[in-house]
Amino acid sequence: IQHQTSELWMKLVIHELAEAMGYIRSDELESSFKILARVKHIQHQLLSQWDVLATLTPSEYVQFRHVLGTGSGFQSAQYRRIEFMMGNKDRNMLRVHAHDPDATAALTKALEAPSVYDEFLRHLARRGFAIPEDLLTRDVSEAHEANAQVVEVFKGIYQNPEKHWDAYEMCEKLVDVEEQFA
């Protein structure tokens, strides 16, 4: 049951992240705030499900452990898709799903699409923030590397939240989601 409910929650996270990215692409940050808050709550629900299993003693757990197999939640195609949508990209992770053509196709599409973070950087560039052009045209299937210019942009947003309220709030929402994901 745990696995099935987790997969349902992850399916909802994927849907919500796609919706949020659409709003960010359309420069409607405010519309994405509630969605990202919902994602944070879904993530919390996913994590809190494990509290029930924590009540089991080792001897109770051993009684049914054999039926769980050797799989890991990290092998879930939906989990990996969420990772890619959030920007944690690694092409090598496709290999885990090579046996499943549908999962591989969905994951490849997510890997090669801009992440939530990519869309936010593009939004900031459209607003005139100094996002380096090479970040906007980079291969989005690769993981991000730290960039001093982007750090300066975020520093400016945080030093003047009243002037850049929606960008500031989006930064906070992304941190909230990332903290729940990590």
Outline where the language-model segments fall.
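Surface-exposed peri-terminal alpha-helical interaction modules
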Residues: 1-182
